């Protein structure tokens, strides 16, 4: 694997310097159906055109727009939401209000089923989860954009750049499930969540249910490199179906460790504060409980 974090820049692998790839970079274009022809990530006038970064031997999708390749995510979500042969379309960035008419956030895509007169029959909500980045990825990006020929194989050691799966779960995925997810569940509407396989692997395992009984479909994708064209292609790795409550609990509730470990840690800190030469043994859990 390269010794720099840049997997894809403006839609193409960093070592792809073909005329097509260079045209996208020169014009700062997005090949994956952004709301505008150009990339608008981070700054509209100076976009951070990094679609994905290396994560060890894998590639992590960091831009949610990257998932729009070939519109596979829309097709896969529709298959979960609606029966076969249903007439449907997708709408982007739809505001969702709560019972107090306050915004609970925008839904990335709402897929709408309709009859032959254009009247809504049903709908489902599709959320797309990119991954936060820890470290400064703009610096290697700018270095690459200034001299792509010499920087495509650069060794980048100035900053450590990596996907931040924990923050992505706590700051993005969990709030979306809590606020928007609860409203949609109360309405009896299905939800689909799109994630990269690396992100999904960091989540707790979910109790599975049959597709027909599920509230949520977790659509898990990866990137496959085509060596002939030197381009990555989005592929669905698997789909997992869950009930809403079970999924929410697994995402928002922490894994609870033993009390003894925390008490031992407290004892170490207390020993440091008191400056004891001979620290007492940490009390057992049974001793603590018997004194209460």
Where are these regions (language model features)?
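Feature targets compositionally biased, intrinsically disordered low-complexity regions
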Residues: 10, 48, 146-147, 221
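Active-site metal-binding core of divalent-cation-utilizing nuclease and nuclease-like domains
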Residues: 64-66, 76-138
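Short N-terminal secondary-structure initiator segments
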Residues: 72-107, 206, 215-239
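An N-terminal, globular interaction/scaffold subdomain
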Residues: 12-83
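Short beta-strand-loop-alpha-helix junction that forms the active-site gateway
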Residues: 127-150, 163-166
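Short amphipathic alpha-helical surface micro-motifs
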Residues: 44-46, 106-111, 174-175, 201-202
